[in-house]
Structures are given as C-alpha cells and as structure tokens.
Amino acid sequence: MTAPGLTAAVEGIAHNKGELFASFDVDAFEVPHGRDEIWRFTPLRRLRGLHDGSARATGSATITVSERPGVYTQTVRRGDPRLGEGGVPTDRVAAQAFSSFNSATLVTVERDTQVVEPVGITVTGPGEGAVAYGHLQVRIEELGEAVVVIDHRGGGTYADNVEFVVDDAARLTAVWIADWADNTVHLSAHHARIGKDAVLRHVTVMLGGDVVRMSAGVRFCGAGGDAELLGLYFADDGQHLESRLLVDHAHPDCKSNVLYKGALQGDPASSLPDAHTVWVGDVLIRAQATGTDTFEVNRNLVLTDGARADSVPNLEIETGEIVGAGHASATGRFDDEQLFYLRSRGIPEAQARRLVVRGFFGEIIAKIAVPEVRERLTAAIEHELEITESTEKTTVS
C-alpha cells in the first residue's frame, strides 16, 4: 500500500520515457521477466529473489554520516511526507525496497549553506547470506552547496532507493561508489529532482560486487537547471555491472551532459559467467523544453576475451527549438596503433597497456572533485590491471 502522505508526491509527476508507470506499491508491478525491456540485460536468476518478492529482509544495512556544520541527519519512518519528493519507483525492485525498509536516512544541507568538506555517507551491507532494504535522501536547500560521497562496503543482498533533492539555485556533487565484496548483489534506484537554476553533478563508480545495477532518473523541475552524470566501471570475470539512466528535460533552458566509461576483463577458462557491463542512456526532451542543450557518451574498453559490453543510447526529441542534442557510443579493444606507438619507443607492452587504460579513465577521474576519491580510483584501476596481467600470464603458460 502507498504510505500516507506520499500521494501528493506522486501527483503531478510527468512520468518519463513514454509515461513509464510509477508507484510506491510493490503489488502494482508484475514480476519481471527476461523479455521485459528494462530487465532484458539483467541476470534475474542471480538477483536472489529481489525481483519476485521471495527475498525477505533478514538483516539491515548500517548507514553512517559524517558530521559537518550546517548538515543535519535524521532517521525517519516511511510515512514522512518528504520521502518520495525526489521521485517514485518505476520498477518492482525499487518499489519492493520502498515497501520493505525499516527506517530512512535523511541528510539535509540548510538553506544558503556552503559545506566546505565532503559529507561522507558509508553504507555497510547486511553481510553474507543476509538481505536488507534501505532508503536514503540527500536534500540541498535553496542556495546551498555540498559534496557528498556515498560509499558502499561489506556484502550481502541489498536493494535501496536514493533520492537527491536539489532546490532552486542549489548545487550538489554526489559521488556514489559500489566497492562491495565479491558476493554482493545490489540494486539501487536513484531519483533526482533539480530545481530552477540548480546544479547536480552525479558520479557513479562500480568496482565490486557480483551483480550491481544502478538506475537513475533525473528530472528538471525548473528552468536553467544543469546536470552532469559521470560513470566509471571496471568489470572482472563473473561480474555484471549495469547502469540505466533517464534524463527528463521538462523545462526550458536546461543542460545535461552524460559521460560513462567502462573496462572489462574476463577469463575464458573460468567456470564463471563472462564479465558483462550494460549501459542504457535515455534522454527525453519534452515539447516545452525549448533551449535544451544535451549530449551523452558511453565508451567501453574490452581488455580480454570472456567479456561483453552492451551499450544502448536513446534520444527522444519533441521540439526542434533546442541548442543541441546528441549521443555517441563505442565499444572496442585496445587501439593497436597506440600500443605500437608506445612499444616503438621502448615501453614494455604491460606498461603500455597501463598507460592506455589510465588515459581512457583519466577524463572522468579528473572531473571528480574529491582528491581522496581520485587517488582511490587510480589505485583500484592499477589493481585491476594487475589482475589482467596475471590472467594473461596464466593463459600463456
């Protein structure tokens, strides 16, 4: 059943991508099947029942928030009227998460407050063999500004909704990191509401976990909004990492830029499934969204055999009175010419490969506003490349 006080949050929302159905009620959704468009890439059998109602909560995730001046953290129940202002679940798992969480964490930056230090939010999973559901809302009030780092650790089976409410003329940089243990299944639905002249920088990083699927809906609720969505992912043998985005331009003179990059490395000799990444990027420009300027890009670098990348950009335009709109997608292996150039200058092949991958991800890492996160990602990529080299040596021997 829909929680009291949330009906108003549902009313008036223009459901995006062909008026996609949305509800807080899990029973309003059918159980997903592989033929469903939004689930056709997702390995449903590996979701441990998150999609069909059989995954009952047996544990809980722990959420801790660092203390900062002007930042308030609250724990609230499902009936709190603020919940759902960022958006409404558009799939069964997100609705299941909303129907099943025990308490929600609200992090609020006060009006006209500029938070100097990043706000750290650590989410620790319920543990191996346990299932949990969660809800997090980050709210930046009018003229406020903050950087928030949401860091996922530990393991287990977890589904949640994450809301980003950015009020008029506010600015939020949100860095979402999935650095789970190898046994983790995590499905996360993000809902962003961007006010008039507000700015959202949304960065997702996927490194760990068995199956990690992040779906993000970004909704402009006033003119002059600006959204930048960045993503970095690195899939190993057996991993499924999936990103699904929808940017809904419903007001004039808004901008959006999407840039996601991923690398994959598998092991054809392994009994595990192939490394698999999925990126689906939807941009909707409504008839009233004149003056829109938008572009989206997805690039994938396949490092070994036993890896597969699916990339699906979509652009729907209902008005011709825009500044610009476009998309690009490419998946390929190492550029042989780049490798040849580097090796011809005496650089060993392994080091040359590292340089190419560093350059591939460097554009995104440089855009992340938190030095500690940049350093961490650089180290993580180096570690992944060590795995690549180890796999290649084993294959050769």
Swiss-Prot record:
SUPFAM superfamilies recorded: Stabilizer of iron transporter SufD
What keywords would UniProt list here? Acetylation
Superkingdom of this protein's organism = Bacteria
Q: Which BP terms from GO are recorded?
A: iron-sulfur cluster assembly
Positions of modified residues (N-acetylthreonine) = T2
Q: Which family does it belong to?
A: Belongs to the iron-sulfur cluster assembly SufBD family.
Extra remark beyond the main annotation: Was identified as a high-confidence drug target.
Q: Which PANTHER family match?
A: PROTEIN ABCI7, CHLOROPLASTIC
Q: What is this protein called?
A: Iron-sulfur cluster assembly SufBD family protein Rv1462
According to its UniProt entry, this protein's organism is Mycobacterium tuberculosis (strain ATCC 25618 / H37Rv)
Q: What is the lineage of its organism?
A: Bacteria, Bacillati, Actinomycetota, Actinomycetes, Mycobacteriales
